[in-house]
């Protein structure tokens, strides 16, 4: 959520900054907010004047009665004044609801470093690590490898649940678990994160706090009759752990690493990546979430990206980093980097992590603040998050990049201690 004061003072600047944001967003609502805010402030001034008048007259009525004067007309005037105040209060409530409705749907303002552009083709590559894997044979796609090795069962996943669900079997299940363990160990013992195991269901306030609601409700799995949502990412419960709290500045930054299952309807992705593990309704992920002071947030973002990189480097998977352009930035981020792993079956890099600085956008929605001392006025914190990284896509990348001509898959050195085998065959 943006700062209403900033909108009030600089509406044209805000409209300009949001005009090429790439969201389905009409900047004309900024003018509506300014108009409503001005009306509300005028009403509040008028209400205060009316209440002051009512209090003064109310204090005089007993004196007039004691003096034997007729106060009938004055009492009638007071009732009318009370109705007027009530009507003003009703209008203020209507304005508040409308402003909140609009504010919850305004995307974040891009950082000046965000490149111009409309689609993912305009994202800017800033780094490559490793070289795309070369083969002296025709490599298989991970869905074929998984089926041939009897470690991924897409058919039974579909039978049990439907399309975009997978059953992991045998060494496939162990590979998934090994990668989870490796990621969590790396982030907690080397990268300085505290491990969190969050709830997999959250309430509406939590989904609103991180920006999934109201805009992306169609992509969420909702549990009917009780208002719970299955989490699309551990970012939601971990960020909302501190909702409506004022944190002490001396404990910042807070760094959490959370493994969870994630659930997404993928309503806008019909026909995309329909085979394999790349786009599933349910998948596992290790999420990195940070809370820090505003002046530290971009340095913390750089470190967050490095932490996500570290697990891919440990697995020896080639990847690149792109800075996301304005048109592809999404709703909540002020600046975002995608880490894309090389996927031989696609003959291109595929997103495996997004690392974002939301600045105070989520903190305003979730009301997360900090202060240096108990006497200081609380200020909104900055929140960041990144995938550290998506597990299913890592499984796919390992299978494809480590496959051998005989159809077996070598286990990366970093996870052999968890797998207890050198090859899947």
Swiss-Prot record:
ATP binds at residues 264-266, 351-354. It catalyses: tRNA(Ser) + L-serine + ATP = L-seryl-tRNA(Ser) + AMP + diphosphate + H(+); tRNA(Sec) + L-serine + ATP = L-seryl-tRNA(Sec) + AMP + diphosphate + H(+). Its EC number is 6.1.1.11. Gene3D superfamilies: Bira Bifunctional Protein, Domain 2 (3.30.930.10), Serine-tRNA synthetase, tRNA binding domain (1.10.287.40). InterPro entries: aa-tRNA-synt_IIb (IPR002314), aa-tRNA-synth_II (IPR006195), aa-tRNA-synth_II/BPL/LPL (IPR045864), Ser-tRNA-ligase_type_1 (IPR002317), Ser-tRNA-synth_1_N (IPR015866), SerRS_1_N_sf (IPR042103), SerRS_core (IPR033729), tRNA-bd_arm (IPR010978). It is an enzyme of class 6 (ligase). GO terms for biological process: selenocysteine biosynthetic process; seryl-tRNA aminoacylation. It is found in: Cytoplasm. Pfam families: Seryl_tRNA_N (PF02403), tRNA-synt_2b (PF00587). Pathway: Aminoacyl-tRNA biosynthesis; selenocysteinyl-tRNA(Sec) biosynthesis; L-seryl-tRNA(Sec) from L-serine and tRNA(Sec): step 1/1. GO terms for molecular function: ATP binding; catalytic activity, acting on a protein; serine-tRNA ligase activity; transferase activity. L-serine binds at residues 233-235, 287, 387. Transmembrane segments: none annotated. Keywords: Aminoacyl-tRNA synthetase, ATP-binding, Cytoplasm, Ligase, Nucleotide-binding, Protein biosynthesis. GO terms for cellular component: cytoplasm. Catalyzes the attachment of serine to tRNA(Ser). Is also able to aminoacylate tRNA(Sec) with serine, to form the misacylated tRNA L-seryl-tRNA(Sec), which will be further converted into selenocysteinyl-tRNA(Sec). Belongs to the class-II aminoacyl-tRNA synthetase family. Type-1 seryl-tRNA synthetase subfamily. Homodimer. The tRNA molecule binds across the dimer. Consists of two distinct domains, a catalytic core and a N-terminal extension that is involved in tRNA binding. This is Serine--tRNA ligase. It comes from Clostridium botulinum (strain Eklund 17B / Type B).
């Amino acid at each position: 959520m943006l700062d209403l004061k900033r909108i009030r003072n600089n509406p044209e600047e805000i409209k300009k900054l949001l005009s090429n944001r790439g969201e389905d967003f009409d900047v004309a609502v900024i003018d509506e907010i300014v108009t409503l805010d001005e009306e509300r402030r005028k009403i509040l001034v008028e209400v205060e004047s009316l209440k002051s008048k009512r209090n003064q007259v109310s204090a005089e009525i007993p004196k007039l009665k004691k003096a034997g004067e007729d106060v009938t007309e004055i009492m009638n005037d007071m009732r009318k004044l009370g109705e007027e105040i009530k009507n003003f209060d009703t209008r203020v409530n209507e304005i508040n609801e409308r402003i909140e409705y609009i504010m919850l749907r305004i995307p974040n303002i891009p950082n000046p470093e965000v490149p111009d552009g409309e689609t993912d083709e305009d994202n800017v590559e800033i780094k490559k690590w490793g070289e795309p894997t070369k083969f002296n044979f025709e490599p298989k796609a991970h869905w074929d490898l998984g089926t041939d090795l009897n470690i991924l069962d897409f058919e039974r996943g579909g039978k049990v649940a439907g399309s975009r669900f997978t059953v992991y079997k045998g060494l496939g299940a162990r590979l998934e678990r090994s990668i989870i363990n490796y990621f969590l160990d790396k982030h907690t013992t080397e990268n300085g994160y505290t491990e969190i195991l969050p709830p997999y269901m959250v309430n509406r306030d939590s989904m609103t706090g991180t920006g999934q609601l109201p805009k992306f409700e169609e992509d969420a799995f909702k549990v009917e009759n009780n208002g719970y949502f299955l989490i699309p990412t551990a970012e939601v419960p971990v960020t909302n752990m501190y909702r409506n709290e004022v944190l002490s500045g001396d404990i910042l930054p807070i760094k959490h690493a959370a493994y969870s299952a994630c659930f997404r309807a993928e309503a806008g992705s019909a026909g995309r990546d329909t085979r394999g593990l790349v786009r599933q309704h349910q998948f596992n992920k290790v999420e990195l979430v940070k809370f820090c002071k505003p002046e530290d947030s971009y340095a913390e973002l750089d470190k967050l990206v490095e932490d996500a990189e570290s697990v891919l480097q440990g697995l020896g998977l080639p990847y690149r980093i792109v800075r996301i352009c304005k048109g592809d930035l999404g709703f909540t981020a002020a600046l975002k980097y995608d880490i894309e792993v090389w996927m031989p079956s696609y003959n291109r890099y595929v997103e495996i992590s997004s690392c974002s600085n939301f600045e105070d956008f989520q903190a305003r929605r979730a009301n997360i603040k900090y202060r240096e001392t108990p006497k200081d006025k609380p200020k909104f914190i900055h929140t960041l998050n990144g995938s550290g990284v998506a597990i299913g896509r890592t499984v796919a990348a390992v299978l494809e990049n480590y496959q051998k001509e005989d159809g077996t898959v070598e286990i990366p050195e970093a996870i052999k201690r968890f797998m207890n085998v050198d090859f899947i065959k």
